[in-house]
Amino acid sequence: DSGNPEKKNPYEKCLRCLGELVGSYDFEHRIAMLGYGGVIPSTGETSHCFPISLTNNPYCNGIEEAIKQYKNSLPKIVLDGPTYFFPIFKENLSMIKYDAKCPTSIYHLLVIITDGTIHDLDEMKRQLIKNQDSPISVCIIGVGDENFSKMYQLDCRTKRLEDKNANKSDRDICQFVRYKDFRDNPDKIAEHLLTIIPS
């Protein structure tokens, strides 16, 4: 029951697995928590990119605060489709432009946890290839029993990403994994994510 804040669902389990990863790479422990595919209480409209806190501030201080915000907000949001990834990716690109003003280099890891199939696959391919020189890697974690066949088209591990115009990626910018493949050893999810962060 994903609406029960007392019960750990796969989303929360994935977030907890990411806690160690965040601690290893982000000395500020700053996490931007964004939701998508939900009816926002303040507007009554479906949004495909919004702060989980339901405020104007998407940032959390550490994984525990991120999970707390998620559990507090989940009962207030009516989940809605279809599943679009590009708005979340676009928002991360905006964050990259802002962080580019900082004196130290910052690398972004966008983790998208989803239980639905993607409806903007072609646009995501195009945008990932277009922005492959940006300091960002994307990992999509599929939870549940949905048919995730489209998601594997975004996975760059075995072949280069290619869009409708035959443009191809030059690096491994995006990977897809199924949560159930790590269900017996969820800590391996964080280890897997480390493999897509450039050294």
Where are each of the predicted segments found?
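Acidic, low-complexity intrinsically disordered regions
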Residues: D1-S199
